[in-house]
Amino acid sequence: MRCFVTRPTAASVTLLVAVSLAVGGCGSTGNSPAAGCLSQPVQSAAPGAAAGWTLPGGNLQNTRAVASPITSSNVAQLGVAWCVPVESTGVTKAAGLANGYATTAVVVNGVVYTQDQESNVMAIRLATGKVLWTHNYNSLNGGPDGVNVVGGTVYAATDSAAVALSAATGRQLWSRTLIGNDHEGIDMAPGYNDGTVYVSTVPVNPNKGQYLGGAKGTLWALNAATGAPEWSWDEVQNLWGNPGINSGGGLWDPPSFDAQGNLYIGIANPGPIGQTGWPKGYPWGTSRPGPNLYTDSVVKLSPQGKLLWYYQLTPHDLYDWDLQDSPVLTTANGQPVVIDGGKAGILIELNAQTGKLLWKLPVGVHSGHDNDGLLTENATPTSTIPLPAKFDLEPGVFGGVESQLATNGSTAFAAVNNLAVPMSAKGVTESSATFEASIGKATGEMVAVNQDTGKIEWDDKLPSSPYGAAAVTNNVVFTTTYNGDLYAFDAATGAILLKTPLSAGTNAPVTIAGDYVIAGAGVPLSTSQQPLIIAYKLGATGKLPDTAG
């Protein structure tokens, strides 16, 4: 069977079929499997594993671990079941992004819900690959974006607003503009807990630029039924005294939630940063002296938005080292802990009650500049900075732990990217074209870390950067790599169980739903490659288009 594609027949909101809420595919929902589906029993869920991938991070704790029939003994039986094209309306192409798709899909009641980098939302029948509806916003965002589906409502965002759609039809129910100025944007999947939707702005607007003065991250708590604000929390209060130049903060991914409804968020970097060039007269972040709270931090907030604690990994960040990944709530040594990592290429484990650091572990390649911010946080524009005039910085802007972690309850898994950039007192010295070429040549690693000790259990070197995060089911860990491969590893040993090509390059994570694995390939690296959302299924025998590769 050849991989087939199904397309919506019109732009804007198009209802192709009435959406039945009955499960029609093969999953672990308790319904009888449909004809032709393999019938392996669902393995008992590891600690923290969800019954299905119904939330952006798998569950409220963002463990990216789910129960499924997929194991190390049958993962090689995954084959192509269906494909749906990622079709740009021209906005991403005009921005040089070419069919951008970077999100983790969610699967609710047998329907796959997802979003592309033009903020367009799509519903796809899991069992057949049939597109049920689309709602096109044609609103460019920086990604990873995505949706959250709860109680028959799809929560999403455009580059400026949080929105709610009917899960059955795609009809918009409400919209709430959140950005404070046109230097800001939104590029995350909303969080949801107990009737409240959580969305943060970021200091990036693809139509205007990034880290422009006055742009900041603000976390909004919105009434899920109406979109009305309940509270907001400023992630970078006062922009450190110079809002005309400074910027910073923002969330890439949804908050995590504990049983009491407390929120845990990972906050992005301050600006200006070296990657975009220092503003005249203010080298090395001297327009923003001090540690620049609460950037590059894990922050715990109460359900009412009160700050409970924070841990800052990179004070006075110079190099775009966001701590942007959703904090993972799990246990270690019998105690609740928070594990996180980001573009600094450092994993941390914190006491969930107090925020105390339990362990800290650099992963991937580091070039010796992890603490440069401490050398410069009290500098003035005329200070002599004890750094080389030129040096190679690693992790660079697209290095470190760029995408989300996963845990099986005892081991944390991190997809690590090794990519250096040349740096100087004026900023990055590499041209855009050279930098883009270097992304394709970069390598990476999948790293497994013992949560009790903070020690590496295994570390698999990869020929291409795994921007596809980590996802776990039973004893299998999945990721995708930039050059367009889907990988599966043995969770205990790191042995590669599966390596199979996608239809194009990718920076999108996978979703595990029953005996399906859904992966997006939205980065064509040649004119022959096709941007597709691909569903792999145990026992399926379809093929990717002949032009892929």
What are these regions (language model features)?
Residues P33-G96, K130-Y137, R171-G180, A228-V236, ...:
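Aromatic (tryptophan-biased) beta-strands that constitute blades/sheets of beta-rich domains
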Residues L293, S302-P303, D320-A379:
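Acidic, glycine-rich loop-and-beta core segments that form the ion-binding/anion-interacting portion
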Residues A50-G58, G96-N120, S139-A162, G185-Y211, ...:
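Repeat-blade elements of multi-bladed beta-propeller folds
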Residues A123, A164, A221, V298-K300, ...:
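Conserved blade-register residue in beta-propeller folds
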Residues M1-V13:
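Bacterial N-terminal signal peptides that target proteins for export
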Residues G27-T29:
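Bacterial signal peptide processing site
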